[in-house]
Design a protein with these regions (language model features):
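Nucleotide-activated sugar donor-binding and catalytic core shared by glycosyltransferases
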Residues: 1-268
C-alpha cells in the first residue's frame, strides 16, 4: 500500500522519463491512497490500478504542545486585539505593517505579530518598519514591552503555534510573492481565519478545502488585506466552532483512510 501519496507536477515529469519502471512499480501496489486529486491523476497516469482519495492525512495531525509565552507576555497580549502574519517573505512584512498602520486608526489597541520565514532577515525588517514610524518590539519573554508597541517581531523558532493560539486571523506569507504559499493547517487547527495571496500552488487543494469550510480567504491587494483583517477583527464568531469543523474534517479523512487500509489487509 502507498499511503498519503503526493506526486507533484515536477516529480511526475521525472517519473515520466522512466515510464516503464514507473508502471512496474505503481501497478504492483494493492492500493494507492493519494493526498490530493492532482496526485490521484498523476498516479493513474503512472500506471497505478487501484487509487483512492479521502483527503490529506496532514489534516489529522494533532496539535503540538505549544511553547508557552510566559506570564508577562500573556498579560500584555490580553490587552490587545491581535492578528498575525506568519512565514512572511520580502515585501510581505511591509505590506502587513502598512495594514497595521491603516487599522490602528480604528483599533487603538491593535497588535500585529510578524513571524518571518527566515529569521536572519530580522535586522532588515526592523529597519524597514522603524522607517514607517511604527513602534516595533523584538520578541523577548523577559523584556518589558512598551504599551504603545505596534509590531511584535518574532525572531525565534518553535513558538509559532503559541502565537497562532492567541490570534484571531493569520496571514500566511509566500503567497503574495511567487513562492507557492505555506501550509495553512497548523493555523487552522487553532481556529484562525487564514488569509493568503494568490500564489498558493504548493497547497492549492488544502486551501480549497479550508475555503469550502469558511476558513480561508484570498487577498490579492493591500486594500483587500486591510478590509479582510478589519472584518475578521470585528466578527464576534467563536474560533472554537472553526476548530471543531477542522477536527470533524480530520476525523472523517482518518476514518475513511483506516477503513480502506483495513479492507485491503483483510483481503490478504
Amino acid at each position: 500500500m502507498l499511503i498519503n501519496a503526493r506526486i507533484t507536477e515536477k516529480s511526475f515529469k521525472k517519473w515520466k522519463f522512466f515510464s516503464s519502471s514507473a508502471k512496474t512499480i505503481f501497478q504492483n501496489f494493492d492500493v494507492c491512497i493519494s493526498s490530493s486529486l492532482a496526485s490521484k491523476n498523476y498516479l493513474r497516469l503512472l500506471g497505478a490500478k487501484k487509487i483512492s482519495y479521502f483527503g490529506n492525512l496532514k489534516f489529522t495531525q494533532s496539535k503540538q504542545t505549544t511553547n508557552e509565552l510566559g506570564n508577562n507576555l500573556n498579560k500584555f497580549f490580553l490587552t490587545k486585539k491581535i492578528w498575525c502574519a506568519s512565514s512572511t517573505h520580502g515585501i510581505e512584512e511591509k505590506l502587513c505593517a502598512n495594514t497595521h498602520k491603516k487599522l490602528k486608526v480604528k483599533y487603538k489597541n491593535l497588535l500585529t505579530i510578524i513571524i518571518p520565514r527566515h529569521i536572519h532577515r530580522v535586522k532588515k525588517i526592523l529597519q524597514d518598519i522603524k522607517e514607517m514610524n511604527l513602534k516595533i518590539h523584538l520578541h523577548d519573554s523577559k523584556k518589558k514591552i512598551d504599551k504603545k508597541t505596534d509590531i511584535y517581531l518574532v525572531n525565534t523558532f518553535g513558538q509559532t503555534q503559541s502565537f497562532f493560539k492567541i490570534s484571531k486571523t493569520v496571514f500566511l506569507g509566500g503567497s503574495i510573492i511567487k513562492h507557492g504559499g505555506q501550509n495553512p493547517l497548523e493555523a487552522a487547527k487553532y481556529g484562525c481565519q487564514i488569509l493568503h495571496g494568490p500564489n498558493i500552488w504548493n497547497f492549492k487543494e488544502i486551501y480549497n478545502l479550508l475555503k469550502a469550510n469558511g476558513a480561508s480567504h484570498k487577498v490579492a491587494t493591500p486594500n483587500q488585506l486591510t478590509l479582510k483583517v478589519s472584518k475578521i477583527l470585528n466578527n464576534k464568531s467563536n474560533s472554537k466552532k472553526l476548530q471543531l469543523k477542522i477536527k470533524n474534517l480530520s476525523s472523517k479523512i482518518l476514518n475513511s483512510t483506516l477503513n480502506e487500509i483495513n479492507f485491503h489487509i483483510k483481503k490478504k
